[in-house]
Amino acid sequence: MKAFAATFTTIALAAASLSAQAQSSVQLTGTIDSYAGSMKLAGQQRVASVGSGGLTTSWWGVKGVEDLGGGLKADFNITSFFRADTGTPGRFDADPFFSRDANVGLAGSFGRVSLGRGLAPNFLPTVLTNPFGDSFTVSPLVLHANMTTAAWGTDSLTTASNTGWSNQILYSTPSFGGLRANVHYQFGEQTGSGNKGKKNVGLNLMYSGGPLSLTAFYERAQINNPVSLAVMPTKSNWMVGGSYDFSVAKLYATYGQAKINAQDRENTTYSLGLDIPVSGTPGTFKAAAARTKSEVGNVSGTRTTVSLGYDHFLSKRTDVYAVAMYDRVSMDIPNKSGTSALVGIRHRF
């Protein structure tokens, strides 16, 4: 904890010093999100607690840009997750300190190229096509893609290998009429003839034009992230999604699939979502549902999750929210379903 505090202070002072020398080139930024509630996912016992990351995983860090002239810029991102309920760094105990971002790059008319740890191909398409965004607590789509329960194991998830990749080369294209693409390549850095050449590769596409947004991604992963970076069974996954803003309501939909070749396993997930702005207020009602079918040979199981919520902005940077969630699996086990309810506050800086 002392080391965490010392690191935070050092980086904050450095950012302040650099900002004074080159105005707005370096920024200390982040989000703090805490909630209180009673949580029970399928297969688990009920827990009443204060938690971190109700709608957004809490994070902080430093970002910077230097204008090199001729339209070329250098930039860097060094950002870290933390648990606001305890002040502990990381999303979990073994999480690397700068597990959100640790990369440096060059950007220009050609797009951007960066080296280091950054987003995996699955992240942006997933969070842009569901009303609860990047919530690892109440977004049905994000939960089915990334989060296990006592009744729903890692092999039943639809994300190949975490929402961020280490040892990565990332190329981001400029916008072509509202269409952007990101090409990801993670070196496996493995030795030995059996594991040589193991790697993660992926691509995503995002289109935005007027009320319509479309996304898609593909990943083929052989390297675990973010801790051990060990070789894992080859897993491939893809998803297509979109949203349309009718002004009175915004609709979301996704469909995706994941396969683990060594197990002959196939996981299929689809989701629907809805945002309804409350007229005359800075508030929005949210509803989302996701269903995943996991099949191994002739054996299959399903998971269904539904969330209903309300998000109210007190300012451009601060909002409060309330969410209720239902989670259920089809297997014949104790506690096969669960309900959760929480209220929280989120502040961006």
Locations of regions flagged by a protein language model:
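Gram-negative outer-membrane beta-barrel proteins
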Residues: 36-44, 82-88, 121-125, 189-193, ...
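Transmembrane beta-barrel strands of outer-membrane/channel proteins
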Residues: 30-36, 78-80, 117, 183-185, ...
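Outer-membrane beta-barrel "beta-signal"
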Residues: 312, 337-349
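Repeated loop/turn-to-beta-strand initiation elements of outer-membrane beta-barrel proteins
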Residues: 68, 72-74, 110-114, 178-181, ...
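Detector for outer-membrane/organellar transmembrane beta-barrel domains
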Residues: 196-307
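Hydrophobic, lipid-facing positions within transmembrane beta-strands of outer-membrane proteins
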Residues: 56-60, 100-106, 165-169, 199-203, ...
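Outer membrane beta-barrel
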Residues: 24-38, 47-188, 197-199, 206-210
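Cleavable N-terminal export/targeting peptides
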Residues: 1-25
